[in-house]
Design a protein with these regions (language model features):
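Sec-dependent N-terminal signal peptides
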Residues: 4-13
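Glycine/tyrosine- and acidic-biased, solvent-exposed loop/turn segments at the edges of beta-strands
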Residues: 16-226
Length: 226
């Protein structure tokens, strides 16, 4: 009888130990797994940068920042997208997430960590724009024959002063005015409704011309004014 009781006690202790291990693993998962290799960076940097290609063929640039270090990964399989990592001066990960390089805005979910590498919060920057995501904007621009990687192409998004998620896009129309100005097509999209609310043409000199005035913008339509 004593042997049976001892056996059950051992099983119970083993079970508790297993649960403790699972809890430890679960808690460990909220810690940042990535660290900045300061020693490798200092040994390989040139002009303050260390540039290399990772195992997936992505170009990686590591730099020093005002408060630590940065790692920027140009994702070859995603259009104009970089994955950014910012690290504390200790090399512990501070924040990570993607940016759309064509507009400099954050996309997808970003994770933020404290100085111990513990996850403190996550923010989904795509959520306000989920009804009209970046993919739809790019598809629309293609339908308008816009150069997605053109010198003057701009794609930007923000929440406006009324709390409406808005897209702002522009590109070179490849039409010169009689004054020889470049013509830009400008579009504003309400991401909640998926509706173009404004289109206008603006103009500028490719090179500064102090002698002639730039033509005034031409409004094609504007639904923002009632």
């Amino acid at each position: 009888m004593k042997k049976i009781i001892l056996f059950h006690l051992l099983c119970l202790l083993s079970s508790c130990s297993g649960q403790d291990k699972k809890t430890e693993v679960k808690n460990e998962q909220i810690k940042a797994e990535k660290r900045f290799d300061i020693k490798r960076f200092n040994e390989n940097k040139k002009n303050g940068k260390y540039i290399y290609t990772d195992s997936l063929g992505n170009q990686v640039t590591e730099i020093t920042t005002k408060r630590g270090y940065g790692r920027y990964v140009s994702l070859k399989n995603e259009f104009n997208v970089k994955f950014l990592y910012h690290f504390y001066s200790t090399g512990i990960l501070k924040e990570e997430g993607k940016v759309f390089d064509g507009g400099g805005f954050r996309i997808g979910t970003w994770n933020f960590y404290d100085e111990k590498g513990i996850l403190t919060k996550s923010i989904d920057y795509d959520k306000p724009f989920e009804k009209h995501p970046l993919e739809k904007v790019l598809a629309y621009m293609k339908s308008r024959k816009a150069e997605l990687l053109g010198m003057y192409t701009r794609i930007y998004r923000k929440i406006d002063e009324k709390g409406v998620p808005m897209w702002y896009i522009s590109w070179d129309a490849h039409q010169r005015t009689k004054e020889d100005c470049i013509t830009m097509v400008n579009i504003e999209i309400d991401a909640q409704k998926g509706e173009i609310v404004k289109e206008y043409h603006s103009f500028f000199w490719e090179y500064n011309n102090p002698y002639d005035k730039v033509p005034a913008p031409v409004i094609i339509f504007d639904k923002t004014k009632k």
